[in-house]
Amino acid sequence: MKNDLNYAVELIRKADGILITAGAGMSVDSGLPDFRSVGGFWNAYPMFKEHNISFEEIATPLAYKHNQELAYWFYGHRLVQYRNTIPHEGYQILKCWAEAKSHGYFVFTSNVDGHFQKAGFDDSHVYEVHGTLERLQCVNNCRGLSWSASSFQPVVDNENLCLTSEKPHCPYCGGFARQNVLMFNDWSYASQYQDFKKVRLESWLKEVQNLVVIELGAGKAIPTVRRFSERTAKAKKGGFIRINPQDAGVPKMHFLSLEMKALDALKAIDTLLNPSQQAVE
């Protein structure tokens, strides 16, 4: 089914729990770059294009060994950018819908920007399958642990592509620390913090009787979110709403496809879902 906003309203109204699944397209509406779109990485970081460095080459543990200054600048710059960006209105719309349900919500996201938590979502109900820049871990994963990055306030030199502030260190072994994000060819990623939330998500799904999955901005380049959304909706025999301006196709007729940007779709659905509130505003 395609572009039927009324059907989206029906699915959300009858649900007793909302599973929000989100890819990079959810963050794009806040003004953040999408590295997986065509030319997206080099458009955001033209200096890497000049040196013919791809996203896959800088987003790897090897970068911390062979190009340490550049790796710390890249992730420090991204952390500063994410912290300085305000999550768009769509996050609050989703939060209002989800908090009204008897079983509430859970978030499954490949985004590492921490914007669901920044928008007020409960961290214990946000499973960040690729980790988050808001946590750090040992470069060598000495204990298999991660910790909050709140005390790490990177100061970046965008001309010389380096940090001017101190690099983070591991509190356990004293070695260097890195962002707690799953990178390419990453065998040292400390997954424990997210693993706990994965278990909570699986337990929550067993409790929900009438699930609706709302997928936002999840592309095909790395289809982790899309596959999880489809698999879960099928297993729970629940409703499924895929929101994507380009890759909105769905595998089943009763699944809903909305060829729209995340924020536009959420606002349009909310207008129909809460007409009295819109009138007051």
Regions found by a protein language model. Name each.
Residues 1-281:
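Conserved catalytic alpha/beta core of Sir2/sirtuin-type deacylases, generalized to analogous enzyme cores
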